[in-house]
């Protein structure tokens, strides 16, 4: 925005292609800022016990599959292969659909961020009777043992010298952990530097 203003003041001609490029950057930055603000607000509500979930019976297999497939084009544009696999066709879970979608988007988006072109992201669902396991596994750069315990910390930016793992504000993963906890579930990561990471969500079928 400031760059365009400066160019206009100097009466510098901007080609339509350049203008479109600058506008795309502005849109992305605006989206990131709005996402950060929303995460800050939600984080505050959760910490103050004022965040309310709207739980209904949902087919978790359909919910996760649709969420992941909606990201398919974005993932493949990065040159990354996407695999979705489940050992159960249908599984009803009492949950807030919007917030579970949000967690899946956060985890898959995180996997994309740290997986190079030619890599693989695999999302799987396993039936554990009274629970369900959702896994987002990537062939990315991985996380060291030392940094695993920090990955869900609020505002933490994980930096591993050997893997150069950067986690931005860290709020996306923090919010995901908080939301899964509100569902009575658990979320954790298994990872090896240079091999990849696997973020695992365990959700109870009924958590009222």
Protein language model annotation of sequence segments:
Residues 28-33:
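Short alpha-helical segment of the dimerization/phosphotransfer core of two-component systems
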Residues 172, 176:
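Short alpha-helical Gxxx[C/S/T] motif in the catalytic ATP-binding
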Residues 143-157:
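Short conserved segment of the HATPase_c
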Residues 156-167:
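Glycine-rich ATP-lid/hinge loop adjacent to the conserved G-boxes
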Residues 44-55:
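Helix-loop junction within the histidine kinase core
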Residues 54-59, 76, 81-91, 128:
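Conserved catalytic submotifs in the C-terminal HATPase_c
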Residues 80, 184-185:
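Conserved glycine-rich
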């Amino acid at each position: 925005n400031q760059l365009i203003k400066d160019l206009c003041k100097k009466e510098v001609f901007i080609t339509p292609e350049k203008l479109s490029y600058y506008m795309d950057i502005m849109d992305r930055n605006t989206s990131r800022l709005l996402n950060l603000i929303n995460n800050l607000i939600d984080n505050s509500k959760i910490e103050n016990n004022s965040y309310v979930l709207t739980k209904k019976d949902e087919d978790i297999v359909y919910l996760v599959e649709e969420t992941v497939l909606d990201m398919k084009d974005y993932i493949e544009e990065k040159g990354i292969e996407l695999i979705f696999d489940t050992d159960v066709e249908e599984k009803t879970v009492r949950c807030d659909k919007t917030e579970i979608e949000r967690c899946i988007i956060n985890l898959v988006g995180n996997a994309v961020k740290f997986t190079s072109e030619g890599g693989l992201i695999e999302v799987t669902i396993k039936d554990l009777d009274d629970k369900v396991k959702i896994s987002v596994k990537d062939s990315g750069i991985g996380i060291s043992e030392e940094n695993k315990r920090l990955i869900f910390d609020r505002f933490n930016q994980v930096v591993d010298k050997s893997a150069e793992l950067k986690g931005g504000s860290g709020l996306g993963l923090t919010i995901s952990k908080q939301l899964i906890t509100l569902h009575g579930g658990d979320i954790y990561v298994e990872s090896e530097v240079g091999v990849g990471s696997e973020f695992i969500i365990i959700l109870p079928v009924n958590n009222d």
